[in-house]
Amino acid sequence: MMGAMSKNMESMPDMAMMDMSVLQACMDACAACEQACTVCSTQMMDCAPACMNCADMCHTMMRSMLRMQGMTPASMMAMLDACIAMCQMCMDECMEHADMSEVCRLCAQACQACTDACTAVKDMMMASA
């Protein structure tokens, strides 16, 4: 089932070549990662800075995907790379505490899912270029 965001995005002329399900999955993963990182940042002081930065990056990535008109492929790739890097850093930090904290384990899982979703969008963009 296509969400309202996907329907709106599909109506944009620049989006005709994009697979809306891949974009929707990435936005969903970014939102889930943002939430998991926000929760983790309030629970574990050791990884709080990484979690807060990752939450901000995921939020920014999701918002950028909602307004892709005017965004060049190069800038979109740079945003995806930045989101992947932030998620990887946060995941690595949270994995150090994952055996002691369920919150950190769940945050690391959300970071991995977001990394995978951003990579899928990059792959789709490269295939359609």
Q: What residue spans do the PLM features occupy?
A:
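Amphipathic alpha-helical hairpins
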Residues: M1-A129
